[in-house]
C-alpha cells in the first residue's frame, strides 16, 4: 500500500476561523456532556444511599455550590435547567447549535446523534419528577459515543475531524484533572 500517494488525494479542507471554532466547541461540549454524566452517577448513587455529603467532591470539582438547601432542586438545575449555562442540558444545546452550523461538513447523519441527545435531555427533564429520567441519561451518553464513532468513521475531511477531537480531548483533560 502506498500511503504517500493516498494522502495526496486528500485535499485540506478550507477551515475558516469560525468553522474551526464551531468544530472545537462541538468537541468540547459533547465531551462535557458525556464525562459529566459518567462522573455524576456514582456520586448520585451514594447520595441516594443516604450520604448527602458524598456529592460535595463532585460539586467542588465543577465549581458548583456545595451547600444544597434543596438537593432535588440543585440536581434539577444542574441537569435540566435550560437557563443555567452550566447545566448538562445547556451543554447539549450548545453542542447542537455548533453541529447545525456544521451540517454541510458533517452530514445530517452525524448531526442526528447530537439531536437525539438533545431530545433525550428534554424528555428526561419532563420525566424528572417521576424518577424515570435516569434511564434517558444512558441514551444521551450512547448518542455521544455514536457521534464520535460516526465522525471517526465518516468521510469528513481529517482536518475537520482533528478540530473536533482536539476540543474533545482538551475538555476531557480539563474535567479529569478536576475530578482527580
What are these regions (language model features)?
Residues 1-180:
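Alpha-helical transmembrane segments and their helix-helix packing motifs
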Amino acid at each position: 500500500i502506498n500511503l504517500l500517494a493516498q494522502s495526496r488525494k486528500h485535499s485540506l479542507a478550507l477551515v475558516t476561523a469560525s468553522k474551526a471554532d464551531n468544530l472545537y466547541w462541538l468537541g468540547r461540549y459533547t465531551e462535557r456532556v458525556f464525562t459529566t454524566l459518567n462522573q455524576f452517577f456514582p456520586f448520585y448513587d451514594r447520595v441516594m444511599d443516604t450520604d448527602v455529603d458524598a456529592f460535595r467532591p463532585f460539586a467542588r470539582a465543577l465549581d458548583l455550590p456545595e451547600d444544597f438547601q434543596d438537593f432535588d432542586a440543585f440536581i434539577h438545575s444542574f441537569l435540566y435547567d435550560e437557563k443555567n449555562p452550566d447545566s448538562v442540558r445547556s451543554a447539549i444545546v450548545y453542542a447542537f447549535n455548533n453541529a447545525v452550523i456544521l451540517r454541510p461538513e458533517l452530514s445530517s447523519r452525524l448531526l442526528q446523534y447530537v439531536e437525539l441527545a438533545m431530545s433525550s435531555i428534554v424528555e428526561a427533564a419532563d420525566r424528572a419528577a417521576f424518577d424515570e429520567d435516569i434511564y434517558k441519561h444512558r441514551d444521551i451518553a450512547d448518542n455521544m459515543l455514536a457521534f464520535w464513532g460516526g465522525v471517526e468513521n465518516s468521510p469528513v475531511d481529517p482536518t475537520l475531524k482533528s478540530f473536533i477531537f482536539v476540543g474533545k480531548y482538551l475538555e476531557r483533560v480539563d474535567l479529569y484533572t478536576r475530578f482527580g
